[in-house]
């Protein structure tokens, strides 16, 4: 899932979680327990005055942060950023002139759908499956993790 914005700040980060991420996991019957981000100002700040931190507190989502200036600590995300840059944006902007962010969002949604549902992935997590198939195969583990957390709280 991806959503384009014309700015980068804490409110936008909270909006993405509220309107895309949390509802998607809820539809799958899984509660989002933790999120990993870098230490950008859009993600980190005083909980009482920072929209993203406030959203996490209201939703009871734990927040882990990568090491400062150490993108390798979030390697999967960094690789995805490189892939989307090389395989979507670099090509899309050569093929077409976009008149609106909504037009670009439509093409991005199609690319993301293909990336998640049609394209198999190598690596230690997907084992030559699509990302959605990997998710579906491990969905029960995520549900059990939530139940384990309930028992210990």
Task: Locate each region found by the language model.
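Short small-residue beta-strand/loop micro-motif enriched in glycine and branched aliphatics
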Residues: 1-3, 64-66, 90-92
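Residues immediately flanking
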Residues: 7, 39, 117
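Surface-exposed charge patches
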Residues: 23, 54, 58, 113
């Amino acid at each position: 899932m991806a959503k384009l914005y014309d700015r980068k700040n804490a409110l936008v980060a909270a909006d993405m979680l509220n309107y895309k991420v949390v509802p998607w996991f809820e539809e799958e019957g899984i509660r989002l327990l933790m999120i990993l981000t870098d230490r950008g100002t859009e993600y980190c700040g005083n909980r009482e005055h920072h929209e993203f931190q406030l959203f996490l507190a209201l939703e009871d989502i734990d927040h882990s942060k990568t090491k400062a200036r150490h993108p390798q600590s979030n390697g999967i995300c960094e690789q995805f950023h490189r892939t989307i840059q090389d395989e979507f944006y670099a090509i899309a902007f050569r093929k077409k002139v976009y008149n609106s962010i909504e037009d670009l969002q439509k093409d991005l949604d199609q690319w993301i759908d293909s990336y998640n549902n049609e394209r198999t992935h190598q690596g230690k997590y997907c084992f030559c499956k699509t990302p959605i198939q990997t998710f579906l195969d491990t969905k029960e583990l995520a549900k059990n993790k939530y139940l384990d957390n309930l028992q210990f709280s």
